[in-house]
UniProtKB/Swiss-Prot annotation:
Gene Ontology molecular function, alphabetical: acetyl-CoA carboxylase activity; ATP binding; carboxyl- or carbamoyltransferase activity; zinc ion binding
Main location: plastid
Function: Component of the acetyl coenzyme A carboxylase (ACC) complex. Biotin carboxylase (BC) catalyzes the carboxylation of biotin on its carrier protein (BCCP) and then the CO(2) group is transferred by the transcarboxylase to acetyl-CoA to form malonyl-CoA.
Protein name in the entry: Acetyl-coenzyme A carboxylase carboxyl transferase subunit beta, chloroplastic
Enzyme Commission code: 2.1.3.15
Length: 498
């Protein structure tokens, strides 16, 4: 059985994760560090680490950092060492093979941690066992090794997120401390022990970032807090919903661009008071009488209309972008996955024809899972129809079409107007593909490399032009249009002429 240490240290400068070889748990020695000075308090804590009563755990083969923790297997024994903002030392011991868990140096932080653990020990589907009389608990009661391993993983996840939250509060000030505390509390409360998944934890502190792949329980925010917080799907950080829209749906913790509704995107891009929608009353009538054993197509359309307040998966219209008149269409992934049916294709085609006649620059914001299967070949025809209208707009009229690819952009949208822009812009970390990862793997029986369908990877393959963050997008579009001789309206001049 291999024994490992996982070490975490908080300083007032940054959250560090270090690794070093060590022979004895009682004599770790100072840790090498090239970025900040050594912490004598931490070193003293390490040297005086509690000697666990289990004789087979007194020697440690090596010390591992966060980057190496994903290499631990289920038979590893490891200890989590840390120090909170009061510089109190504490350690958490896991022996997965012998199913032992313990906490040393109990204080307020650990009491909260133990309280969280106790809910697992007392859960109805696990058999209770005896506790030792030692200062730490000896839980050797699990007849379900799979359940034990999953829970150990969730404990590590909870610990890492709490440490990162404390570090963020130290770096950004006392105001965010309460927010990170609430974030840790809600994330812990929202843990669902009945489901497991594959999650990615990512953070950045003073330019130092790391990634952790792990199996953990579902960490979705519970319905209880959903009206207050928006949880990032990448780092699981919580963003205050009241300010999330003003932040352009960008996670404050890791900078990930979360999905936006079409209405929010229009508000972000178009000048206030200039938006004039087109074809709002157009909706699908189930042209092929699509048969579904679950929910009829018409009923499904009605439910999405009530849910989103939209009639279809795209909004089209005319507006001004920093004073420049533009024709813009914005797809909405919340409406049936942004799928392209006959109505979506017709609205886009009419928008392109209007922009052609009025000599307006064109913007199409893509967010779609592809062609809508409920409309069969009629949805596939939209690809050719839109491409034909774009040919007249671009080749004959020599006008400028900007395609903006957001996450996700897949299927028939990628294969048609998504990739036909004179300038193709992608959002950071956008998922862009023709066939999705699951479809490729099930069809070809081959594994799709991680990240091979992400915007950053595809950018280096020359698939599109720039990757532009949302907070810079409006300015970039304005400069591009002016470069192509589309200038803001001069309102003073127009008043004089009239």
């Amino acid at each position: 059985m291999k024994k490992c240490w996982f070490h975490s240290m908080l300083s007032n400068v940054e959250l560090e994760y270090r690794c070093r070889l060590s022979k004895s748990m009682d004599n770790l020695g100072p840790l090498e560090n090239t970025s900040v000075s050594e912490d004598p308090i931490l070193n003293d804590t390490e040297k005086n680490t509690y000697n666990w009563s289990h004789s087979d755990s007194s020697n440690v083969d090596h010390l591992v950092g966060v980057r190496d923790i994903r290499n631990l297997n289920v038979d590893d024994t490891f200890l989590v060492l840390g120090r909170d903002n009061k510089k109190d030392g504490y350690s958490i011991y896991f022996d997965i093979e012998n199913q032992v868990f313990g906490i040393d140096n109990n204080h307020s932080f650990l009491s909260k941690l133990e309280k969280e653990f106790s809910s697992y020990w007392n859960s109805s589907y696990l058999n209770k066992g005896s506790r030792s009389d030692d200062s730490h608990y000896d839980y050797s009661m699990y007849d379900n090794k799979y359940s034990w391993n999953n829970y150990i993983n969730s404990c590590i996840d909870s610990y890492l997120r709490s440490q990162i939250g404390i570090a963020s509060s130290i770096l950004s000030g006392s105001e965010s401390y309460s927010e990170s505390y609430i974030s840790t509390y809600i994330l812990g409360e929202s843990r669902n022990s009945s489901e497991t998944g594959n999650s990615r934890l990512r953070t950045s502190t003073n330019g130092s970032d790391f990634a952790l792949r792990e199996n953990s329980n579902d960490l979705g925010v519970t319905q209880k807090y959903k009206h207050l917080w928006v949880q990032c799907e990448i780092c699981y950080g919580l963003n205050y919903k009241k300010f999330f829209k003003s932040k352009m749906n960008i996670c404050e913790q890791c900078g990930y661009h979360l999905k936006m509704s079409s209405s929010d995107r229009i508000e972000l891009s178009i000048d206030p008071g200039t938006w004039d929608p087109m074809d709002e009353e157009m909706f699908s009538l189930d042209p092929i009488d699509f048969h579904s054993e679950e929910e009829p197509y018409k009923d499904r359309i009605d439910s999405y209309q009530k849910k989103t307040g939209l009639t279809e998966a795209i909004q089209t219209g005319i507006g001004q972008l920093n004073g420049i008149p533009v024709a813009i269409g914005v797809m909405d992934f919340q409406f049936m996955g942004g799928s392209m049916g006959s109505v979506v294709g017709e609205k886009i085609t009419r928008l392109i024809e209007y922009a052609t006649n009025q000599f307006l620059p064109l913007i199409l914001v893509c967010a779609s899972g592809g062609a809508r299967m409920q409309e069969g070949s009629l949805s596939l025809m939209q690809m050719a129809k839109i491409s034909s209208a774009l040919y007249d707009y671009q080749s004959n009229k020599k006008l400028v079409y900007v395609s903006i690819l957001t996450s996700p952009t897949t299927g028939g949208v990628t294969a048609s107007f998504g990739m036909l822009g004179d300038i193709i812009i992608a959002e950071p970390n956008a998922y862009i593909a023709f066939a999705g990862k699951r479809v490729i793997e099930q069809t070809l029986n081959k594994t799709v490399p991680e990240g091979s369908q992400a915007a950053e990877f595809l950018f280096h393959k020359g698939l599109f032009d720039p990757i532009v963050p949302r907070n810079l997008l409006k300015g970039v579009l304005s400069e591009l249009f002016q470069l192509h001789a589309f200038f803001p309206l001069n309102h003073n001049l127009s008043r004089t002429l009239t």
